[in-house]
């Protein structure tokens, strides 16, 4: 398997994935569930198809639910363990803890490669960038706005946290080497009552650099958004 695609999948799972255990309807034991969600209507989102391929075709994609949501998921123990093991070395401790809790509460043992003392393989900068691209494909924003002489551009990723800067955002800032970490900020939105942190790049040069670094591993949706933002920003400059 391509380790860059696995690193991308791990980043995407950090952004959009979840793992838990729940009681089974037909017996007293608990079962694990791993899922990744994406909005979509007419067709399965490309990002879910890519994730499915990156984890070796394990799990299933279903939807749309209520005509707006698809998800990849697996409840099979073998597939759960295999997907967890594939992504483990690129996951943050927060996501590892979620997978570990789901496994332990279901009465299962962690795969040896996922043991706390397991050594991580050497991590290439290219796989770090692939992870960031996956995370950005899931949670990122890029856009340009304004008018001639008053143009702005922004590339950002927001995350909620109860206490400190999320390790995911710290990793993004470290790998890309541009932009700033900001927060915490209390949001007015009803959907999130937790303080919000954000990694953000507002300088055109920083945004252009970050896009160039991630381009090889970004999905088509974020590529199109990035291209549109950069071109719009430049067009507003020419019109000034």
Where are the language model's segments positioned?
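Internal intein/HINT superfamily modules and their associated LAGLIDADG
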Residues: 1-240
């Amino acid at each position: 398997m391509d380790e860059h695609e696995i690193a991308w999948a791990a980043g995407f799972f950090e952004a959009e994935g979840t793992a838990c255990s729940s009681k089974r309807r037909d017996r007293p034991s608990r079962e694990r569930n791993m899922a990744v969600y994406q909005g979509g209507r007419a067709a399965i989102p490309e990002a879910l198809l890519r994730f499915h391929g990156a984890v070796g075709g394990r799990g299933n994609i279903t939807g749309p639910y209520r005509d707006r949501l698809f998800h990849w998921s697996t409840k099979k123990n073998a597939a759960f363990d295999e997907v967890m093991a594939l992504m483990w070395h690129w996951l943050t401790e927060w996501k590892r803890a979620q997978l570990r809790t789901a496994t332990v509460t279901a009465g299962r043992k962690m795969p040896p490669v996922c043991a706390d003392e397991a050594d991580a393989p050497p991590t290439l900068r290219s796989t770090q960038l692939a992870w960031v691209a996956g995370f950005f494909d899931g949670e990122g924003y890029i856009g340009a706005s304004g008018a001639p002489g008053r143009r702005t551009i922004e590339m950002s990723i927001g995350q909620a946290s109860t206490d400190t800067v999320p390790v995911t955002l710290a990793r993004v800032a470290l790998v890309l080497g541009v932009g700033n970490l900001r927060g915490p900020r209390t949001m007015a939105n009803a959907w999130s009552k937790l303080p919000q942190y954000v990694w953000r790049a507002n300088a055109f040069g920083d945004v252009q650099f970050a896009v160039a670094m991630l381009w090889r591993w970004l999905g088509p949706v974020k590529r199109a958004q990035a291209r549109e933002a950069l071109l719009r920003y430049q067009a507003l400059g020419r019109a000034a």
